[in-house]
């Protein structure tokens, strides 16, 4: 199988242990930070006046990620038009080498137009909330200019 016995990399094992300890001790704090930012993001999107649909039941989604479709905006055009100031995605990492409709969104029963306008926005626990909102405001302005 190509696996041979050898010396365990002690530094890597210790690093993994510390990462696990931090993940456990900071979990609740990180979840609260994610949710606070998600509420602010959803509020801004709602007040923006763009026509959108959230993809997926938010009760079962990660608190640091939103997948939404902006009606009348091609996700590829939005992604390319906003790459100077923010990073959004319109597909999954496992299909990044070629553009094809998201198999997850397809399996969820979304139609082709909704899938082609879907973007994923995510943030970390330490993402600055004001910076996130400012960049999202810019993204919304670009989206409004791309509506067809």
Show where each model-derived region lies.
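Pyridoxal 5′-phosphate
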Residues: 1-148
């Amino acid at each position: 199988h190509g696996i041979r016995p050898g010396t365990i990399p002690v530094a890597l094992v210790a690093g993994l242990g510390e990462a696990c300890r931090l993940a456990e001790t900071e979990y609740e704090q990180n979840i609260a930070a994610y949710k606070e930012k998600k509420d602010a993001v959803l509020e801004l999107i709602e007040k923006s006046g763009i026509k959108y649909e959230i993809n997926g039941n938010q009760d079962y989604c990660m608190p640091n990620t939103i997948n939404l479709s902006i009606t009348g905006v091609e996700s590829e055009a939005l992604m390319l038009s906003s790459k100077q100031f923010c990073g959004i995605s319109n597909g999954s990492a496992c299909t990044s080498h070629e553009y094809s409709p998201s198999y997850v969104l397809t399996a969820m029963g979304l139609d082709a137009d909704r899938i082609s306008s879907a973007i994923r926005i995510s943030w970390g626990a330490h993402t600055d909330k004001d910076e996130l909102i400012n960049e999202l405001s810019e993204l919304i302005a670009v989206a409004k200019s791309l509506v067809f």
